[in-house]
Amino acid sequence: MAQTERRDAPELPDFSLLKRLARDQLIFLLEQLPGKKDLFIDADLMSPLDRIANVTILKQHEVDKLYKVELKPIVSSSDQLCFLIRPRIQTVKWISDLVNSDKVAGRFRRYKIIFTPQKFYACETVLEEQGVYGDVTTDEWNFYILPLDDDILSLELPEFFRDNFLEGDQRWVTTGGGALHLLQSVYGSFSKVYGIGRCAKMVYESWRELMEEGEQRTRQPEFAKVFLIDRDVDFVTPLCSQVVYEGLVDDIFRIKCSSVEFGPDVTSSDKSIKVMLNSQDKVFNEIRNEHFSNVFGFLSQKAKNLQTAYDKRRGMDIQQMKAFVADELKGLKQEHRLLSLHIGASESIMKKKTKQDFQELLKTEHSLLEGFEIRECIAYIEEHINRQVSMIDSLRLLCLLSITENGLLSKDYRSLKAQYLQSYGIEHLLTFANLRQLGLLEEQQTGETLTVMESKVGKLVNDKTAGKLTDAFSSLAKKSNFRALSKRLALVPKSGEEYDLRVPRDMAYIFSGAYIPLSCKLIEQVLERDGWTGLEEVTRMLNGQDFAVTGGSSSSEARNKSNGQRIILVMFLGGCTYSEISALRFLGKERGCRFIVLTTAITNSGRLLEALLDKHV
């Protein structure tokens, strides 16, 4: 049932300090523009900003009115305008147009742009090109990390995934390095750094440069080991349907900055309610990592216990009643409210999943993971597409089929692609190109074709160049290697084995016992081995780019043995799912350690695939 913390679990660092640092810096920057001012905020910064400095705090520092950046003419009458934005060229061009428009109208105002988490040279170039560089002041708000919960930190950069992995835009690499540098500055140095993936390597290099430039302070480290992993190392995990409670809530209601909006179908009223989902919500904290099949039983027992606590009032004298009202009643009412919401959310999830025939969907996914009944799986996917059930869900199943089968046979690829475009629109043709580029949805390349090309080109060049070309052709023919990886790391339990979801034996419980997430299995294996030794075959199948670096002094490592050595930071570059976080929490309990997840953003199959849709769709 509900998982409980081990008594010997290490204490987590206090991440509220990161919020205070971010708040203090923002206030300092706002005060650089003295007097009343209107503040324009990027839409995707509004929720994170509310967690750092709410409207009351902003008003205390002479912010008069707040507006959302909408890239259209403004209605502000203030003489001072402040813009809090991400470093995006489109937004900077819009600000430049506003300034130039005021110039034409003979209107004098003061303008300040605060870029967060950092400003890029390209943005300053736009200001110069538009002729407004001398009319605005620019600053940086180094808001690298938003603590979402006791063990979840986020850069809140959902665009990181598309920009880095699809567009090849590496501008956010320095942001990742800056986030690690901030953690090291505040919570002490790390003794060991492990990583896998091209982006992970670049983020590590960026962080190392910042360390070499900055002043090194010696202090008691609060956590020691760091593991950096690229999202493209493991695409299977985010493409699987989530079945732990927190993951399901995210899939259906979309959690944003640890907050979710429950509609009338959940609240049993005509109003929607915004709820914070974190460890402060005691009901949620007990069920967040549970497989959904266990949640109703837990909530039912909780409701009975609550009723028993209420029933204590009967037979109380006046003094006892006073004490009950003063000490317990408020807490019971709050628990009752939260319990009602989570029961409502569970019922809503159940209705939606029953309507979607969720069990049949899971059966298909599990067959794909195991490599069984592939023709039946393809027939199910075809039916899914032809019934136009869900554009994203159909795409997800196609990608899962392609990755687990190391690409699709030509006839299957062409047939499924044609059916998809016919059902959802020809405009998705470019989306297929994006998916192919990332290796998510590919047509199998026959070995003969590559061999013929290789031999023909090889005759035209010398041996040295031919060697390089062979490597290039090998990379063209690279496959996801999921089947081999699955066998090597025992990711898929043997078919027919009984799996008790009430008493999970490994991380596979997060996918109903069908699959251990590759990302989390890699972390487990590397920590057990204290490096990549013995995993050479695995890293080769993952196209290399693995590293393990010892940092800090031996005395630092000795100090870590008590608490810090048992707290491990895992940085996901390109996004992390709530299912992976649940798996790492389970692994932490098994190993007697705690994992802190630092991610560029929380993701799921919907967000990941939406990021890869062609921008014109």
Curated annotation (Swiss-Prot):
Major subcellular location class: membrane
GO cellular-component term (any): lysosomal membrane
Keywords: Developmental protein, Endosome, Lysosome, Membrane, Protein transport, Transport
Subunit structure comment from the entry: Interacts with vipas39.
Family: Belongs to the STXBP/unc-18/SEC1 family.
Name this protein carries in UniProt: Vacuolar protein sorting-associated protein 33B
Record-level GO BP terms: intracellular protein transport; intrahepatic bile duct development; vesicle-mediated transport
Tissue expression pattern: Widely expressed from 4 hours post-fertilization (hpf) to 24 hpf. At 48 hpf, localized to brain, retina, ear, liver and proximal intestine. This expression pattern is more pronounced at 72 hpf and persists through 5 days post-fertilization (dpf). At 3 dpf and 4 dpf, expression in the liver is predominantly in developing biliary epithelial cells. No expression detected in kidney or spinal cord.
SUPFAM superfamilies per record: Sec1/munc18-like (SM) proteins
Keyword GTP-binding carried by entry: no
Keyword Protein transport: yes
Entry's localization field: Late endosome membrane; Lysosome membrane
Gene: vps33b
Membrane topology: Peripheral membrane protein
PANTHER family xref list: VESICLE PROTEIN SORTING-ASSOCIATED (PTHR11679)
UniProt function note: May play a role in vesicle-mediated protein trafficking to lysosomal compartments and in membrane docking/fusion reactions of late endosomes/lysosomes. Required for proper trafficking and targeting of the collagen-modifying enzyme lysyl hydroxylase 3 (LH3) to intracellular collagen. Mediates phagolysosomal fusion in macrophages. Proposed to be involved in endosomal maturation implicating vipas39. In epithelial cells, the vps33b:vipas39 complex may play a role in the apical recycling pathway and in the maintenance of the apical-basolateral polarity. Plays a role in bile duct development.
